[in-house]
Design a protein with these regions (language model features):
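Short cytosolic juxtamembrane segments of multi-pass membrane proteins
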Residues: 236-243
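Transmembrane alpha-helix boundary and packing residues in multipass membrane permease domains
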Residues: 32, 36, 114, 118, ...
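Residue-level recognition of membrane-helix boundary sites in multi-pass small-molecule transporters
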Residues: 19-20, 93, 158, 189
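A short amphipathic helical element positioned immediately N-terminal to and/or at the very start
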Residues: 3-15, 203
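Alpha-helical transmembrane segments and their short interhelical loops
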Residues: 91, 95-168, 210-222, 227-230
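Membrane-interfacial helix-loop-helix junctions in multi-pass membrane proteins
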Residues: 42, 46, 123, 174-228
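Transmembrane helix boundary and interhelical loop/hinge segments in multi-pass membrane proteins
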Residues: 14, 65-89, 243
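Hydrophobic alpha-helical transmembrane segments of multi-pass membrane transport/permease proteins
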Residues: 13-41, 49-69, 106-109, 165-171, ...
Length: 243
Protein backbone atom coordinates (compact mmCIF):
# COMPACT_ATOMS: atom_id res chain seq x y z
CA UNK A 1 0.00 0.00 0.00
CA UNK A 2 2.80 2.42 0.93
CA UNK A 3 4.60 1.55 -2.29
CA UNK A 4 1.49 2.20 -4.42
CA UNK A 5 0.97 5.57 -2.75
CA UNK A 6 4.53 6.54 -3.59
CA UNK A 7 4.09 5.21 -7.15
CA UNK A 8 0.99 7.39 -7.55
CA UNK A 9 3.00 10.41 -6.45
CA UNK A 10 5.75 9.57 -8.97
CA UNK A 11 3.18 9.25 -11.77
CA UNK A 12 1.88 12.75 -11.02
CA UNK A 13 5.44 14.07 -10.99
CA UNK A 14 6.13 12.56 -14.42
CA UNK A 15 2.95 14.07 -15.87
CA UNK A 16 4.00 17.51 -14.62
CA UNK A 17 6.70 17.54 -17.31
CA UNK A 18 4.67 16.98 -20.51
CA UNK A 19 7.30 18.49 -22.82
CA UNK A 20 9.98 15.89 -22.06
CA UNK A 21 7.33 13.17 -22.02
CA UNK A 22 6.05 14.16 -25.47
CA UNK A 23 9.61 14.37 -26.78
CA UNK A 24 10.39 10.88 -25.52
CA UNK A 25 7.22 9.48 -27.04
CA UNK A 26 7.48 11.45 -30.28
CA UNK A 27 11.15 11.24 -31.23
CA UNK A 28 11.04 7.50 -32.13
CA UNK A 29 8.11 8.30 -34.45
CA UNK A 30 10.15 10.97 -36.21
CA UNK A 31 12.98 8.47 -36.73
CA UNK A 32 10.50 5.91 -38.02
CA UNK A 33 9.11 8.40 -40.52
CA UNK A 34 12.52 9.62 -41.71
CA UNK A 35 14.02 6.16 -42.14
CA UNK A 36 10.89 4.95 -43.92
CA UNK A 37 11.24 7.85 -46.33
CA UNK A 38 14.89 6.93 -46.83
CA UNK A 39 13.90 3.33 -47.52
CA UNK A 40 11.39 4.48 -50.14
CA UNK A 41 14.10 6.32 -52.08
CA UNK A 42 17.13 4.13 -51.36
CA UNK A 43 15.91 0.59 -50.62
CA UNK A 44 17.83 -1.01 -47.75
CA UNK A 45 16.59 -4.28 -46.26
CA UNK A 46 17.49 -3.12 -42.74
CA UNK A 47 15.11 -0.16 -43.07
CA UNK A 48 12.11 -2.11 -44.35
CA UNK A 49 9.23 -1.18 -42.07
CA UNK A 50 8.75 -4.72 -40.72
CA UNK A 51 12.45 -4.85 -39.80
CA UNK A 52 12.77 -1.25 -38.66
CA UNK A 53 9.79 -0.89 -36.33
CA UNK A 54 10.83 -3.52 -33.74
CA UNK A 55 14.26 -1.92 -33.51
CA UNK A 56 12.86 1.58 -33.10
CA UNK A 57 10.62 0.42 -30.25
CA UNK A 58 13.69 -0.90 -28.41
CA UNK A 59 15.68 2.28 -29.10
CA UNK A 60 12.78 4.37 -27.80
CA UNK A 61 13.15 2.73 -24.40
CA UNK A 62 16.43 4.60 -23.89
CA UNK A 63 14.33 7.68 -23.12
CA UNK A 64 12.78 5.78 -20.20
CA UNK A 65 16.29 5.62 -18.75
CA UNK A 66 16.55 9.39 -18.91
CA UNK A 67 13.09 9.89 -17.38
CA UNK A 68 13.71 7.57 -14.44
CA UNK A 69 17.22 8.90 -13.79
CA UNK A 70 16.05 12.50 -13.81
CA UNK A 71 13.12 11.73 -11.52
CA UNK A 72 15.30 10.05 -8.88
CA UNK A 73 18.09 12.62 -9.14
CA UNK A 74 15.62 15.49 -8.65
CA UNK A 75 14.05 13.78 -5.65
CA UNK A 76 17.45 13.13 -4.10
CA UNK A 77 18.26 16.83 -4.29
CA UNK A 78 14.95 17.84 -2.74
CA UNK A 79 13.86 17.89 0.89
CA UNK A 80 10.86 15.68 0.06
CA UNK A 81 12.87 12.49 -0.37
CA UNK A 82 14.84 13.17 2.80
CA UNK A 83 11.54 13.34 4.69
CA UNK A 84 10.36 10.14 3.01
CA UNK A 85 13.49 8.38 4.26
CA UNK A 86 12.01 8.60 7.76
CA UNK A 87 8.90 6.63 6.69
CA UNK A 88 8.61 2.81 6.75
CA UNK A 89 9.30 2.68 2.98
CA UNK A 90 12.15 0.29 2.13
CA UNK A 91 14.68 0.67 -0.67
CA UNK A 92 12.72 -1.87 -2.71
CA UNK A 93 9.51 0.13 -2.13
CA UNK A 94 11.18 3.26 -3.46
CA UNK A 95 12.60 1.56 -6.57
CA UNK A 96 9.30 -0.18 -7.40
CA UNK A 97 7.44 3.05 -6.71
CA UNK A 98 9.54 4.77 -9.35
CA UNK A 99 9.36 1.84 -11.77
CA UNK A 100 5.63 1.07 -11.74
CA UNK A 101 4.40 4.35 -13.31
CA UNK A 102 7.15 4.25 -15.94
CA UNK A 103 6.34 0.74 -17.21
CA UNK A 104 2.92 1.74 -18.64
CA UNK A 105 4.58 4.72 -20.33
CA UNK A 106 7.19 2.42 -21.90
CA UNK A 107 4.48 0.04 -23.11
CA UNK A 108 2.43 2.97 -24.37
CA UNK A 109 5.41 4.21 -26.35
CA UNK A 110 5.79 0.76 -27.93
CA UNK A 111 2.09 0.60 -28.82
CA UNK A 112 2.24 4.07 -30.38
CA UNK A 113 5.26 3.07 -32.50
CA UNK A 114 3.52 0.00 -33.89
CA UNK A 115 0.28 1.89 -34.55
CA UNK A 116 2.20 4.69 -36.25
CA UNK A 117 4.00 2.17 -38.46
CA UNK A 118 0.79 0.59 -39.80
CA UNK A 119 0.01 3.42 -42.28
CA UNK A 120 3.67 3.21 -43.36
CA UNK A 121 3.12 -0.39 -44.47
CA UNK A 122 3.67 -2.48 -41.34
CA UNK A 123 2.21 -5.97 -41.62
CA UNK A 124 -0.79 -6.30 -39.29
CA UNK A 125 -0.91 -9.53 -37.29
CA UNK A 126 -1.39 -10.90 -33.78
CA UNK A 127 2.41 -10.97 -33.52
CA UNK A 128 2.33 -7.24 -32.80
CA UNK A 129 0.71 -8.05 -29.46
CA UNK A 130 3.41 -10.62 -28.69
CA UNK A 131 6.11 -8.10 -29.57
CA UNK A 132 4.56 -5.51 -27.24
CA UNK A 133 4.41 -7.99 -24.36
CA UNK A 134 7.91 -9.25 -25.11
CA UNK A 135 9.44 -5.80 -24.73
CA UNK A 136 8.64 -5.68 -20.99
CA UNK A 137 11.97 -7.21 -19.79
CA UNK A 138 13.96 -4.66 -21.79
CA UNK A 139 11.73 -1.87 -20.49
CA UNK A 140 12.51 -3.00 -16.94
CA UNK A 141 16.23 -2.95 -17.75
CA UNK A 142 16.12 0.60 -19.14
CA UNK A 143 14.06 1.95 -16.27
CA UNK A 144 16.21 0.19 -13.65
CA UNK A 145 19.37 1.54 -15.28
CA UNK A 146 17.94 5.03 -15.01
CA UNK A 147 17.11 4.47 -11.35
CA UNK A 148 20.66 3.27 -10.77
CA UNK A 149 22.14 6.34 -12.45
CA UNK A 150 19.75 8.63 -10.60
CA UNK A 151 20.83 7.06 -7.30
CA UNK A 152 24.48 7.83 -8.06
CA UNK A 153 24.58 11.06 -10.09
CA UNK A 154 23.01 14.50 -9.87
CA UNK A 155 20.43 16.03 -12.21
CA UNK A 156 23.00 17.70 -14.50
CA UNK A 157 25.10 14.55 -14.71
CA UNK A 158 22.22 12.23 -15.61
CA UNK A 159 21.25 14.61 -18.40
CA UNK A 160 24.60 14.06 -20.07
CA UNK A 161 25.06 10.41 -19.20
CA UNK A 162 21.55 9.09 -19.84
CA UNK A 163 20.38 11.70 -22.32
CA UNK A 164 23.50 11.72 -24.46
CA UNK A 165 25.95 8.89 -23.81
CA UNK A 166 23.51 6.06 -23.08
CA UNK A 167 21.11 6.98 -25.88
CA UNK A 168 23.94 6.86 -28.41
CA UNK A 169 25.40 3.65 -26.99
CA UNK A 170 22.04 1.89 -27.15
CA UNK A 171 21.63 3.06 -30.75
CA UNK A 172 25.08 1.92 -31.93
CA UNK A 173 25.14 -1.35 -30.00
CA UNK A 174 21.61 -2.48 -30.85
CA UNK A 175 22.07 -3.05 -34.57
CA UNK A 176 19.12 -0.82 -35.45
CA UNK A 177 21.04 1.45 -37.83
CA UNK A 178 23.46 -1.06 -39.35
CA UNK A 179 24.25 -4.76 -39.36
CA UNK A 180 26.76 -5.40 -36.56
CA UNK A 181 28.28 -8.22 -38.60
CA UNK A 182 29.54 -5.63 -41.07
CA UNK A 183 31.75 -4.22 -38.31
CA UNK A 184 32.54 -7.54 -36.63
CA UNK A 185 35.53 -8.01 -34.37
CA UNK A 186 35.61 -6.63 -30.85
CA UNK A 187 32.71 -4.26 -31.52
CA UNK A 188 30.37 -7.12 -32.39
CA UNK A 189 31.52 -9.13 -29.36
CA UNK A 190 30.87 -6.18 -27.04
CA UNK A 191 27.42 -5.70 -28.58
CA UNK A 192 26.61 -9.40 -28.14
CA UNK A 193 27.63 -9.21 -24.49
CA UNK A 194 25.11 -6.42 -23.84
CA UNK A 195 21.31 -6.68 -23.93
CA UNK A 196 20.53 -4.12 -26.65
CA UNK A 197 21.06 -6.26 -29.73
CA UNK A 198 19.36 -9.20 -28.03
CA UNK A 199 16.29 -7.04 -27.38
CA UNK A 200 16.15 -5.92 -31.01
CA UNK A 201 16.57 -9.45 -32.34
CA UNK A 202 13.95 -10.76 -29.92
CA UNK A 203 11.47 -8.09 -31.00
CA UNK A 204 12.08 -8.89 -34.66
CA UNK A 205 11.65 -12.61 -33.98
CA UNK A 206 8.42 -12.09 -32.03
CA UNK A 207 7.04 -9.83 -34.74
CA UNK A 208 7.84 -12.40 -37.42
CA UNK A 209 6.39 -15.23 -35.31
CA UNK A 210 9.69 -17.05 -34.77
CA UNK A 211 9.21 -17.77 -31.06
CA UNK A 212 12.03 -20.30 -30.93
CA UNK A 213 14.54 -17.67 -32.04
CA UNK A 214 13.02 -15.13 -29.65
CA UNK A 215 13.51 -17.51 -26.73
CA UNK A 216 17.27 -17.63 -27.34
CA UNK A 217 17.51 -13.91 -26.56
CA UNK A 218 15.38 -13.87 -23.40
CA UNK A 219 18.04 -15.02 -20.90
CA UNK A 220 20.63 -12.22 -21.35
CA UNK A 221 17.91 -9.56 -21.21
CA UNK A 222 16.36 -11.08 -18.08
CA UNK A 223 19.73 -11.43 -16.34
CA UNK A 224 20.67 -7.82 -17.05
CA UNK A 225 17.23 -6.61 -15.90
CA UNK A 226 17.47 -8.47 -12.59
CA UNK A 227 21.10 -7.47 -11.97
CA UNK A 228 20.55 -3.78 -12.68
CA UNK A 229 17.38 -3.69 -10.56
CA UNK A 230 19.25 -5.23 -7.60
CA UNK A 231 22.11 -2.76 -8.07
CA UNK A 232 19.62 0.12 -8.15
CA UNK A 233 18.08 -1.01 -4.85
CA UNK A 234 21.51 -1.40 -3.21
CA UNK A 235 22.72 2.02 -4.38
CA UNK A 236 19.49 3.66 -3.29
CA UNK A 237 19.83 2.09 0.17
CA UNK A 238 23.38 3.43 0.44
CA UNK A 239 22.14 6.92 -0.42
CA UNK A 240 19.42 6.58 2.23
CA UNK A 241 22.02 5.72 4.87
CA UNK A 242 24.23 8.64 3.84
CA UNK A 243 21.37 11.12 4.11
Amino acid sequence: MRMMTFANRCAKEILRDPINLCFGLGFPLVLLLLLSALQANIPVSLFEIDMLTPGITVFGLSFMTLFSATLVAKDRESALLQRLYTTPLTGFDFIMGYMLPLLPIALGQTVICYLFAIPLGLTISINIVYAIIGIIPMAVFNIALGLLCGSIFGVKQVGGICGGLFTNLSAWLSGVWFDLKLVGGVFEKIADALPFVHAVEMEKALFSGDFGLAATHVLPIALYSIAITVMAVVCFLKQMKKQ
